[in-house]
């Protein structure tokens, strides 16, 4: 994979994948965000560099550089400003655009935008260099819209490539777009009306003036307001649901009536605990809390700006306070969200000085009212959290912002327990007490959690999931011994041979794990013979020796918790098993195998964050019903830390009832990993070369594949565990069998198919093999049907990447998976 190097200054350069010897790549695309002179009041440049595009997307991009500052200039310029925006307003006037900026508002063609977070972007219609103006009512809206525009422009450049960045397109598409504006995006203006609601359209000339073309307009807010007006109420004493007429018809109405009763009862139980028996919260809230039931997470994100089981409203004029996507297992999350609304209505967060200075305490207060957390009372999680050494520190719990290494799954019950520990019977009294705590006092309380009763674990859940008539993979591999080692590790759960596909998430709202397009992709995979998928969350590490890990998943375009849970549930609904497989994404052009700390202090810090990351997802894997769990992926430089791995495996076993594996790197982890006997499956990302000869024929590839299979069989027998190919793949490039872990170069579907046919022909289905997960497909490939067909076909046919659907390799994979 091509690496990217983040500079410390205002520019970040990402090199394109290396080509052949002496090959000179194309000039990098330079995207420039020009901020006003004296930007200190708004901090626009700093906010752009703290944004999602700069921090999360740019390191993945191919051939893109971003410049930010008052003198920034590039292939495309974005002039960024905040009302009254003298710089941008002057440019708009000189271009004759229907844009007017006042002290507190931005007007476009007579429409006034003055709400916090709203912003307008317009393209200047003249000049040889494409220039956009982005003006916000406030800095937050301006930066958010500029960030959105950067994603659009980078995608137009074809920079996302295999990263699944967005709407497609490639450099050839851009170059073919002749004329003075090769960066035409299909719209000339874009308005951020709400976090996910946009207005877009094009200019036209009328009587010598530039005006909005009504035929080209798309106005999300107007459409949403029209749809929201059609929603019907299901009234209750304390909670009123809003749902579409179709959803309230037939059996859907009975389901929603049960939901309304549950939520109404939850509010009735929680309200008296806010301020006490004489408080106004004992009376029926006036008006009731209005909750909109969304059809899916994509619609929820468009209406609120984020996704989750239940999230607050964000659009101007919203009738609802909360928007939820219904699943019967998520009632606990709806109760927590309702508790948050009760706290806000009572003014307790503000009165306690809590929001926004202590977000973890705000979450904890809501959970203290709601009670349950991922299937059990929140207090029952505390012994496991303490024993697994994943508790936050006092400083982290009292921090004024949510750190990216923090885990909502793991830390919210701790915050609720801290609230509960305070004197008083009401939330108001407890918040008054917790407000006075210091980090040292919280640390002292946290130290006492280790003395609590042992965690109950998942023994009952494991027994409930077992299928006594099935033959376990471990028994198939070892001739009947389905136990682990002599220390009594858990046996492998009963699973058949896994015909798997590594299903990476496309980083887009419409194509993510949470999106309806996922169902179409799962259908397609099942049709080709797959019966399992792996799902992959990510943590980010800035470099191989950086001790901090940052949990990703902060927005709908990334691998969110709710998206992963939804994907597991949908896979099960389609009859597919799931391998839940956390990855670490390492910056600085590196890869997970390079991760190694410089000293013991850094190792302790890294392991603390890694435990938090893995156990966060182990809880989600259990809750969603995943079938297998991987404790790591290709972390070769950490394998010498055997004790830390042993402790992590033990902690995972207490919450996850299914088989455990580790996705070892093909180049040495099979032999070096010290913990195979503690796991149920030996796992390997199997990118073994089949031949060093670029011109190898079928016979030579078959011999190379036989040698690979012999090595795999030896590893399985040496560790007395079945072996799972956690990844196996070949890119669609010339001579892919010489270095299967690489992509890029000269495209060749034929060589990709030949390599798969050789390996699978030698592999067969021996009893020691638990299955394979082919690398890779994307969750949103079905959503690509909405993209321009010609560009999509060109990209699929010519990209030398690992995708196999729709290529010759699909037939080779389907043939292997059809064998029984």
Predicted regions and their residues:
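Substrate-binding cleft and catalytic face of glycoside hydrolase catalytic domains
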Residues: 496-499, 504, 528-547, 561-638, ...
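Short, acidic/polar
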Residues: 511-525, 607-620, 666-675, 756-762
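Aromatic-rich peripheral "rim/lid" segments of glycoside hydrolase catalytic domains that contact
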Residues: 464-465, 470, 490-495, 513, ...
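Solvent-exposed alpha-helical segments and adjacent loops
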Residues: 9-226
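Acidic/His/Gly-enriched intrinsically disordered linker/tail segments
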Residues: 306, 310-319, 333-334, 352-465
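Juxtacatalytic substrate-recognition/specificity segment
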Residues: 78, 235-357, 376
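Surface-exposed, active-site-proximal loop segments in enzymatic domains
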Residues: 510-511, 539-560, 586-606, 696, ...
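Glycoside hydrolase catalytic-domain groove-lining segments
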Residues: 560-561, 566, 573-574, 581, ...
């Amino acid at each position: 994979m091509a690496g990217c190097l983040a500079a410390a200054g205002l520019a970040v350069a990402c090199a394109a994948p290396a080509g052949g010897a002496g090959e000179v790549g194309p000039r990098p695309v330079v995207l420039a965000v020009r901020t006003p002179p004296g930007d200190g009041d708004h901090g626009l440049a700093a906010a752009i560099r703290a944004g999602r595009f700069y921090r999360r997307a740019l390191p993945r991009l191919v051939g893109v550089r971003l410049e930010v500052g008052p003198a920034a200039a590039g292939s495309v310029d974005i002039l960024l400003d905040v009302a009254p925006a003298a710089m941008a307003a002057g440019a708009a006037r000189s271009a004759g655009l229907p844009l007017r900026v006042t002290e507190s508002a931005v007007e476009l063609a007579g429409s006034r935008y003055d709400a916090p977070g709203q912003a307008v972007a317009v393209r200047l219609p003249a000049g040889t260099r494409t220039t956009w103006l982005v003006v916000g009512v406030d800095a937050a809206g301006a930066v958010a819209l500029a960030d959105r525009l950067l994603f659009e422009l980078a995608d137009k450049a074809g920079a996302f490539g295999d990263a699944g960045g967005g709407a497609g397109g490639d450099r050839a598409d851009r170059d073919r777009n002749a004329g003075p504006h090769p960066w035409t995006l299909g719209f000339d203006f874009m308005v951020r009306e709400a976090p996910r609601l946009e207005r877009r359209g094009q200019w036209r000339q009328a009587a010598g003036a530039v005006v909005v073309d009504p035929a080209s307009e798309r106005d999300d807010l107007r459409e949403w307001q029209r749809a929201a007006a059609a929603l019907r109420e299901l009234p209750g004493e304390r909670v009123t649901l809003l749902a579409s007429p179709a959803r309230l018809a037939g059996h859907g109405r009975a389901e929603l009536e049960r939901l309304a009763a549950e939520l109404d009862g939850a509010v009735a139980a929680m309200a008296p605990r806010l301020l006490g028996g004489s408080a106004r919260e004992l009376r029926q809230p006036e008006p009731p809390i209005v909750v909109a039931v969304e059809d899916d997470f994509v619609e929820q994100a468009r209406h609120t700006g984020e996704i989750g089981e239940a999230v607050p409203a964000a659009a101007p004029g919203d009738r609802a306070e909360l928007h939820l996507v219904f699943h019967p297992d998520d009632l606990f999350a709806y109760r927590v969200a309702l508790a948050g609304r009760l706290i806000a209505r009572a003014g307790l967060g503000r009165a306690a000085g809590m929001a926004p200075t202590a977000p973890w305490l705000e979450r904890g207060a809501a959970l203290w009212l709601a009670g349950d957390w991922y299937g059990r009372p929140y207090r029952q999680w505390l012994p496991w959290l303490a024993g697994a050494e994943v508790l936050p520190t006092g400083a982290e719990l009292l921090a004024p912002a949510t750190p990216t290494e923090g885990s909502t799954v793991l830390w919210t019950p701790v915050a609720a327990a801290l609230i509960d520990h305070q004197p008083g019977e009401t939330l108001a009294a407890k918040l008054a007490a917790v407000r006075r705590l210091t980090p040292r006092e919280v640390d002292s309380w946290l130290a006492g959690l280790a003395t609590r009763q042992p965690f109950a674990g998942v023994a009952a859940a494991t027994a409930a999931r077992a299928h006594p008539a099935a033959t376990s993979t471990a028994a198939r591999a070892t001739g009947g011994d389905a136990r682990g080692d002599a220390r009594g590790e858990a046996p492998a759960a009963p699973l058949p041979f896994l015909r798997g596909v590594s299903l990476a998430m496309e980083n887009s709202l419409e194509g993510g794990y949470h999106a309806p397009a996922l169902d179409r992709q799962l259908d397609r995979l099942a049709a080709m013979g797959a019966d399992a998928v792996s799902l992959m969350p990510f943590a980010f590490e800035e470099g191989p020796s950086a001790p901090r890990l940052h949990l990703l998943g902060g927005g709908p375009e990334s691998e969110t918790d709710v998206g992963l849970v939804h994907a597991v549930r949908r896979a099960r609904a389609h009859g597919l098993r799931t391998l839940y497989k956390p990855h670490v994404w390492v910056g600085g052009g590196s890869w997970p195998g390079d991760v190694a700390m410089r000293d013991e202090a850094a190792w302790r810090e890294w392991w603390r964050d890694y435990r938090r990351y893995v156990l966060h997802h182990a809880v989600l894997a259990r809750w969603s019903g995943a079938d297998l769990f991987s404790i790591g992926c290709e972390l070769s430089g950490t394998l010498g830390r055997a004790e830390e791995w042993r402790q992590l495996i033990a902690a995972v076993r207490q919450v996850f009832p299914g088989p455990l594996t580790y996705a070892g790197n093909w180049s040495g982890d099979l032999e070096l990993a010290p913990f195979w006997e503690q796991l149920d499956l030996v796992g390997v990302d199997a990118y073994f070369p089949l031949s060093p000869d670029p011109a190898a024929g079928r016979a030579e590839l078959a011999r190379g594949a036989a040698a690979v299979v012999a090595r795999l069989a030896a590893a399985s027998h040496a560790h007395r565990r079945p072996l799972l190919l956690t990844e196996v793949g070949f890119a669609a490039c010339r001579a892919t069998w010489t270095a299967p872990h690489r992509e890029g170069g000269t495209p060749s579907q034929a060589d990709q198919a030949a390599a798969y046919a050789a390996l699978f022909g030698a592999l067969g289905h021996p009893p020691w093999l638990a299955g394979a997960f082919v690398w890779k497909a994307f969750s949103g490939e079905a959503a690509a049907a909405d993209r321009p067909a010609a560009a999509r076909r060109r990209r699929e046919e010519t990209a030398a990447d690992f995708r196999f659907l729709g290529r010759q390799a699909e037939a080779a994979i389907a043939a292997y998976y059809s064998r029984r």
